[in-house]
């Protein structure tokens, strides 16, 4: 695949660098380019050490809620991968001032991880801030991550044996964080995608009845799907300790799913990487153990 990658040594800050997406961005950057410095932004250095990043990757303490960590994290950095805190109902309060800090430092590029149908959730405000910043940007819009079932908000349902969500017979085109990480690493370094908002999806949508059958096969126990009402789903989330604003955020995403906004199939991953994305079936086969009869997920690397 033809790329337009500069030979100048880059320094990239990956926010959320030890998270489910950020770690994939770091690992993909390490694989693609040796002549870069990678700052792994996070709050837990021990977790960073356990992930086994390469010698070009260095942990830096970074917290959107602690502006005193920003200057040191951005020192010498010319590009940033920007990801909001999970299910943050007001990302503009923390990311907005950070984007202003990036403007002050005249960064060369910001790559933002958003979501398909971002207009329904607060992430659209972050898109607008970056688009109006005057900085070079790329916005990536995925649907739900497949890894939500192994270490995200859907893992609870798998552990309990029943996927209970307000989605009916509608489908979602799940995407693996491996593909997101690879896409992000490329657009961070390659100028030909600059200024674009790109929707990236898996290869095909799958409804939740089909999905539960795929997971059952690979987990080694029966996983049921139960369609529930949005208000019941909100209560279930809050009973698990998820805040009401975050529960509302997730409900909005499932509204997008019921309107078939998350079932679209785009060529975004192929356009950026030159290969097709992983399917949900491939994710399930690679991720879940089927030897114990329980939902045990392998580490996502």
Swiss-Prot record:
Signal peptide extent: none
Superkingdom to which the source organism belongs: Eukaryota
Gene3D superfamilies with a match to the protein in the record: NAD(P)-binding Rossmann-like Domain (3.40.50.720), UDP-galactose 4-epimerase, domain 1 (3.90.25.10)
GO molecular function: NAD binding; NADPH binding
Biological process annotations from GO: aggregation involved in sorocarp development; positive regulation of gene expression; sorocarp development; sorocarp stalk cell differentiation
Family: Belongs to the NmrA-type oxidoreductase family.
Function field: Involved in development and cell differentiation.
This protein's name: Prestalk A differentiation protein A
